[in-house]
């Protein structure tokens, strides 16, 4: 797939209209690419949200400045809820207890992956608090079903990476000795760009440690 989504930011409406027309002409004349009128347009970020790669954002006043406020996009949030609910149901399902460890590993991997991506949104903590309520609720309800393993509020955090990232959370739970990564425990992190020095044309590319967290890889395996 090609990365064909982009946003251009301008200070006023007239400049934005001119920039959009110039961009359309440039893409058509130089790259022979047609733009979609339905997906292209000008948005006033002081009044409305715009969505980009699963994140919706606008600007809000803060003192004498305007700052970005961003959330998970509505469609993205619904997809996350559906995916996590399906795995959580399998964890609770008495007939699937033989696959409990597999399902818990899948659930934890999904939660950590979603946190790693959506943490760039400034309001990600609020968004995942809502997701947590809809997916696991109070979670202790599982304890009323004697055929399921009880959810415990204390246990051992076996992964150093998870302990470093989630260890302070009071939302941690354990099932049959396996820890459940708290879906509602995430904070905003400023997005970082990939260093230009890390690419396949330079020797530094051989240092795979620049790109991959071995702690995460070890836990996933």
Task: Show where each model-derived region lies.
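Non-catalytic terminal/accessory segments
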Residues: 1-221
């Amino acid at each position: 797939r090609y990365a064909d989504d982009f946003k251009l930011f301008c200070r006023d409406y007239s400049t934005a209209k001119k920039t959009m027309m110039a961009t359309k002409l440039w893409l058509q004349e130089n790259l022979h690419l047609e733009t979609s009128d339905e997906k292209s347009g000008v948005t006033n970020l002081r009044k409305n949200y715009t969505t980009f790669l699963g994140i919706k954002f606008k600007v809000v006043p803060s003192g004498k400045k305007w700052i970005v406020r961003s959330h998970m996009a509505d469609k993205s949030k619904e997809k996350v809820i559906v995916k996590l609910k399906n795995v959580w149901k399998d964890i609770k399902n008495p007939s699937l207890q033989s696959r409990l460890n597999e399902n818990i590993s899948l659930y934890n991997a999904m939660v950590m992956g979603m946190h790693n991506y959506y943490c760039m949104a400034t309001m990600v903590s609020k968004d995942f608090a809502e997701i947590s309520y809809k997916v696991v609720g109070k979670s202790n309800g599982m304890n009323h079903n004697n055929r399921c393993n009880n959810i415990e509020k204390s246990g051992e955090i076996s992964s150093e990476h998870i302990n470093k990232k989630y260890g302070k959370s009071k939302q941690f739970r354990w099932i049959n000795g396996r820890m459940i990564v708290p879906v509602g425990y995430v904070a905003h992190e400023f997005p970082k760009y990939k260093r230009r020095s890390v690419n396949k044309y330079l020797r530094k590319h051989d240092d795979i440690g620049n790109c991959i967290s071995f702690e995460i890889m070890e836990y996933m395996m």
